[in-house]
From Swiss-Prot:
It holds the Pfam family p450. The lineage of its organism: Eukaryota, Fungi, Dikarya, Ascomycota, Pezizomycotina. CDD domains: CYP57A1-like (cd11060). Keywords: Glycoprotein, Heme, Iron, Membrane, Metal-binding, Monooxygenase, Oxidoreductase, Transmembrane, Transmembrane helix. The gene is vrtE. Heme binds at C459. This is Cytochrome P450 monooxygenase vrtE. Its EC number is 1.-.-.-. Glycans are attached at N137. It comes from Penicillium aethiopicum. Its cofactor is heme.
């Protein structure tokens, strides 16, 4: 009896163990089949690239986590001697400048990849779109850009005088350009700001939360399935059916305040109604009134995209312009000489800085080219019928292909043999260069400048970013004489989704004859 019981017990254990083996074996076979189908994906077998990347997106995730993706990408193209590199089971990096128009042009049939899903904000448990039809030039002209720009420049100069110039203290300019950018874009978006410059730091943890959000997006961008598992899985939706991101809730409160304000004006006279601020929040609400299908969640998505494009990414460009201008004294001297020939009001008006100060404009263009703000590529998905690339190779439909702005921006055939260097002169006519040849060279550089994207899906925040950059750079150098605390040291560049530079501490002084009284 005892022996029979023991035998039965062991048989049950063996049966359970065998079942576990079968389950594990089935899972292993499924994974093996999945990875082999990835490796032998039709049309991509012959595209060179890292061996591991042909099986799984984990290779790209690891490179992003290492903060090496941008640095390693050019080396991959060089070592394989190929303009097409397979960096994922169904993902290809392209370094051929001839493909810019094919992939991103106005007549392209390429669609956006799953990248946009990982970038979308969460509101009430649902992802919200962030793309908004760009307003025409008349609409942009109605937005209170000049007022916002003047306010922000005056504020930052006052704070620099109070905190750094008079006390002779070092200024962490890498942080202050972000405070400036955030306050300015908030002024343009909702005609008020959160007071980053006044506080001299973060307010209510907004910048800290934004950084965490952008870091997460960098990881989710490398492997989109992480986002589906982490944020949008059924368990998370069940326990948090109306979850919203911290930043999304901040945008929600901004919109609610504006809606209450505009509703209070609806019953007033026409003259009083005309006093409504023509900022981005007003334009978003106007769009919703004309098209009721636009939800509050979509409005929050629009606003969030506006704030991110106009703050974090803009700060990257301004830091780059300041850093390289101070690192190369000849650039600083030539810029100051150009600024000294200007006798108009300060802050320098946008149109003058953009179109009448060629060397200042060249510095900004070079900063945009030299330091592409994002770690990732601008991804697109090939049309169902597939596509023939400029080198004659054919890619099947449904493949994600992209170009990295840094990779194209450093193409020597387009930007010159010194494409790895910071040289604003490349954007200007060379001594003795015929005008026709200069214009041809400039057109080629413009056509391959991906700083704000390219084609119909280019960055809708371009106008906002340019407004901030062209307002800050000339006014800062016209009034301030900066010098690095440790000029022999290089800055520190941190990367995940958006690059963040630091290590730019400097001493500030007013230039001779300049001061707060110089501001209009």
């Amino acid at each position: 009896m005892f022996i029979a019981a023991v035998t039965h017990n062991w048989m049950e254990r063996l049966a359970a163990l065998s079942l576990l083996h079968y389950v594990l074996g089935a899972i292993f076979l499924l994974l093996l089949f999945h990875m082999l189908s990835n490796f032998f994906h039709p049309g991509l077998v012959d595209v060179p690239g890292p061996f591991a990347a042909k099986f799984t997106d984990l290779w790209r995730l690891f490179k992003v986590w290492q903060r090496r993706f941008k640095e390693d990408l050019p080396g991959l193209h060089a070592s394989h001697r190929s303009t097409l590199i397979r960096i994922g089971p169904r993902m290809v990096s392209c370094s051929d400048p001839r493909a810019v128009e094919l992939i991103y042009g106005f007549h392209t049939e390429f669609s956006k990849s799953d990248m946009v899903k990982a970038m979308a904000p969460i509101y009430k448990g649902k992802k919200q779109p962030t793309m908004f039809a760009a307003a025409d030039n008349k609409t942009h002209a109605r937005i209170r850009k000049p007022v916002a720009g003047a306010y922000a420049m005056t504020s930052i100069m006052q704070r620099m005088d109070e905190l750094f110039i008079r006390p002779k203290r070092a200024c962490d300019i890498h942080n202050w350009v972000q405070y400036f950018a955030f306050d300015m874009v908030l002024e343009m978006t909702m005609s008020r700001n959160l007071g980053f410059m006044k506080a001299g730091g973060d307010v209510d943890g907004v910048l800290k939360q934004l950084q965490k959000d952008l870091d997460y997006r960098g990881i989710a961008l490398a492997m989109p399935i992480i986002d589906r598992i982490w944020r949008l899985n059924p368990v998370s939706k069940f326990f948090k059916p109306k979850q919203s991101g911290h930043f999304a809730m901040r945008c929600k409160r901004i919109l609610e305040d504006r809606m209450a304000y505009e509703k209070s004006l609806d019953s007033r006279t026409q003259q009083q109604q005309d006093q409504k601020p023509h900022d981005f929040a007003h334009r978003f609400l106007e769009a919703q009134r004309k098209d009721p299908s636009i939800s509050d969640g979509q409005l929050i998505g629009y606003m969030q995209a506006n704030l991110i494009a106009g703050s974090d990414t803009t700060a990257v460009v301004m830091r780059t312009a300041i850093y390289y201008t101070l690192k190369q004294p000849w650039i600083l001297q030539r810029l100051v000489t150009e600024l000294d020939q200007y006798h108009g009001p300060l802050p320098v008006p946008f149109r003058i800085a953009r179109f009448e100060m060629p060397f200042c404009g060249a510095i900004v263009r070079e900063a945009l080219r030299r330091h592409f703000a994002f770690i990732g590529m601008m991804e697109r998905q090939t049309p169902p019928c597939g596509v023939v690339m400029p080198d004659g190779r054919r890619l099947p439909g449904g493949v994600v292909i992209g170009m990295h702005g840094d990779l194209i921006g450093r193409d020597r055939a387009i930007f010159g043999e010194d494409a790895d260097e910071f040289n604003p002169l490349r954007w200007l006519a060379r001594p003795g260069e015929p005008e026709a040849k200069y214009q041809e060279r400039l057109r080629a550089m413009n056509a391959h400048d991906l700083a704000f994207g390219h084609g119909p899906r280019g960055c809708i925040g371009k106008h906002v970013a340019e407004m901030e950059i062209y307002k800050f750079i000339p006014t800062f150098f016209a009034l301030i004489q900066p010098r690095f605390m440790r000029p022999e040291q290089s800055w520190t560049v941190r990367q995940l989704f958006v690059f963040k530079q630091s290590g730019m501490d400097m001493m500030l002084d007013w230039r001779q004859g300049k001061g707060l009284q110089s501001m209009a």
